[in-house]
């Protein structure tokens, strides 16, 4: 999909701050520093609409971006960052749970994992949490450019097995450097919002 317009709408914490208008939403979740902002920027052809950070755990709000006036990307705070206090982690959990369970506009969650590594316990917990609530998931395995092409299948198998990816959910290998998987990611997203 060609993105001609993309802007941040609001950084929200509470449901009353979520945008109105009924546009379909795709939430993006992933461990801190997994490359979520790079994934968003790569999909929308912008250098830094979603701010990339060398400081993990920087996003502490739900950041709503409007894309081509037809859908919202919702950047969810990164999970699994050890230096965040227990209180902050609990607040994060409540905010995510409220959004995922109450938001009718939510069509799917893009869960971002690092193709180079076996998904972490936090990744597995997040995937299971989404499945528990019946949320469709698109798993994006980033940093494919850091692995020789001949090993992609082996790494993809580890991701599939560790997360126990449901047959209805997709796995897309992606690289924000080479743009590998960009079209597949968009196709998967558009299929979910057009259901």
Swiss-Prot record:
Keywords: Cell cycle, Cell division, GTP-binding, Magnesium, Metal-binding, Nucleotide-binding, Septation. GO terms for biological process: division septum assembly. Its cofactor is Mg(2+). It comes from the Bacteria. Residues 22-195 form the EngB-type G domain. Mg(2+) binds at residues 37, 59. This is Probable GTP-binding protein EngB. It comes from Bacillus pumilus (strain SAFR-032). The lineage of its organism: Bacteria, Bacillati, Bacillota, Bacilli, Bacillales.
């Amino acid at each position: 999909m060609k993105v001609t317009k993309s802007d941040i709408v609001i950084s929200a914490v509470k449901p009353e701050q979520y945008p109105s208008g009924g546009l379909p939403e795709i939430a993006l979740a992933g461990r801190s520093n997994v490359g979520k902002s790079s994934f968003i920027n790569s999909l929308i052809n912008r250098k830094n609409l979603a701010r990339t950070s060398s400081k993990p755990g920087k996003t502490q709000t739900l950041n709503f971006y409007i894309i081509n006036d037809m859908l919202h990307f919702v950047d969810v705070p990164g999970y699994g960052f050890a230096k965040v206090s227990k209180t902050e982690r609990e607040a994060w959990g409540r905010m995510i749970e409220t959004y995922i369970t109450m938001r009718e506009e939510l069509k799917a969650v893009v869960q971002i994992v690092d193709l180079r590594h076996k998904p972490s316990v936090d990744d597995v917990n997040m995937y299971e949490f989404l499945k528990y609530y019946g949320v469709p998931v698109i798993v994006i395995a980033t940093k494919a450019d850091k692995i020789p092409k001949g090993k992609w299948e082996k790494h993809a198998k580890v991701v599939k097995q560790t997360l126990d990816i449901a047959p209805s959910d997709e796995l897309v290998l992606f690289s924000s450097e080479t743009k590998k998987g960009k079209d597949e990611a968009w196709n998967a997203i558009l299929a979910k919002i057009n259901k």
